[in-house]
């Protein structure tokens, strides 16, 4: 199994909690899927906690503390504040996968906006009342496809 780790030199703007969480994740050899199952969130939401891009609930803190053997008071100190979202990646991003996601918005952003406005009227899709997931799909030729679902309240 290949596990996501953290190279802090590539992410100097992440909160202290990121180093704490990623070190424990690596020490325990846990995937985000395993962590998500333990805390009762999906794997993208769990990963967002590690990158400081989502707010941890008191229950998340207790469950992460149990799973990762991190003292609860330390996680309470590091995760109880409000996330400083959007600072973790310079723009435009240099990491190729992150750049491709950015490129999707560059290329299709106005097309998404036009279709969404036609379907829902004037407004915006929430990134607060929001969920997302990643699935793997394999076609009949054996090619793997990434399926990313974005679900936001209108």
UniProtKB/Swiss-Prot annotation:
EC number from the UniProt entry: 4.2.1.104
UniProt enzyme class: lyase
Keyword Transmembrane recorded: no
MF (Gene Ontology): cyanate hydratase activity; DNA binding
Protein's UniProt keywords contain Lyase: yes
Short name of one Pfam family: Cyanate_lyase
CDD domains, per the entry: Cyanase_C (cd00559)
GO biological processes: cyanate metabolic process
Keyword annotations of the record: Lyase
Gene3D superfamilies: Cyanate lyase, C-terminal domain, lambda repressor-like DNA-binding domains
Catalysed transformations (reactions): cyanate + hydrogencarbonate + 3 H(+) = NH4(+) + 2 CO2
Catalytic residues (UniProt): 100, 103, 126
Listed InterPro entries: Cyanase (IPR008076), Cyanate_lyase_C (IPR003712), Cyanate_lyase_C_sf (IPR036581), Lambda_DNA-bd_dom_sf (IPR010982)
Sequence similarity: Belongs to the cyanase family.
Main function: Catalyzes the reaction of cyanate with bicarbonate to produce ammonia and carbon dioxide.
The protein's name in its UniProt record: Cyanate hydratase
Organism: Aspergillus terreus (strain NIH 2624 / FGSC A1156)
């Amino acid at each position: 199994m290949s596990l996501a780790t953290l190279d802090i030199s590539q992410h100097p703007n992440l909160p202290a909690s990121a180093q704490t969480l990623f070190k424990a994740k690596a020490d325990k050899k846990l995937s985000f899927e395993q962590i998500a199952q333990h805390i009762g969130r999906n794997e993208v939401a769990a990963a967002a906690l590690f990158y400081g891009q989502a707010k941890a609930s008191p229950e998340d803190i207790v469950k992460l503390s149990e799973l990762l053997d991190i003292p609860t008071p330390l996680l309470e100190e590091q995760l109880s504040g409000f996330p400083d979202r959007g600072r973790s990646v310079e723009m435009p991003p240099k990491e190729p996968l992150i750049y491709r996601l950015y490129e999707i918005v560059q290329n299709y952003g106005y097309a998404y906006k036009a279709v969404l406005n036609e379907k829902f009227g004037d407004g915006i899709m929430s990134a607060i009342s929001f969920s997302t997931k990643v699935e793997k799909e394999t076609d009949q030729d054996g090619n793997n496809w990434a399926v990313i679902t974005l679900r936001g309240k209108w």
